[in-house]
């Protein structure tokens, strides 16, 4: 069984590269949905549908033992739903590095570059609110 890495395009290849370096004895499947990229300009419902469809394929049909959602937009839109749908499968999402930026800087001012959909969603707002006081 493999660990699946999913992104809306090819950006997640850098995540896959790091995973291979850290876990060289694991098998990996990479799926980049270039046909539907970019996800950031789509509606929440569209991103959820695409992400859930690809996760289903990777987990149920490709028998992935874990899933890395290597896309901020897909993470923001669907990672909670995926964790509910597949409680026995470890699912890891990628989020903007707000926490490390806030923790490791004195008097932090952080610029977050993200897709329009990621900016609109509650997940990023909650993350920023959680670390705003630091």
What are these regions (language model features)?
Residues 1-134:
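Non-catalytic structural scaffold of enzyme domains
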């Amino acid at each position: 069984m493999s660990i699946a890495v999913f992104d809306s395009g090819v950006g997640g290849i850098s995540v896959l590269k790091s995973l291979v370096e850290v876990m060289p004895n694991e098998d990996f499947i990479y799926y980049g949905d270039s046909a539907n990229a970019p996800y950031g300009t789509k509606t929440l419902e569209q991103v959820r549908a695409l992400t859930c469809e690809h996760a289903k394929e990777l987990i149920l049909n490709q028998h992935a033992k874990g899933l890395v959602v290597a896309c901020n937009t897909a993470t923001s839109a669907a990672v909670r739903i995926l964790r509910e749908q597949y409680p026995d499968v470890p699912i890891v999402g990628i989020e903007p590095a707000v926490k490390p930026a806030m923790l490791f800087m004195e008097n932090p001012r952080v610029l977050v570059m993200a897709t329009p959909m990621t900016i609109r969603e509650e997940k990023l707002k909650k993350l920023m609110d959680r670390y705003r006081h630091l």
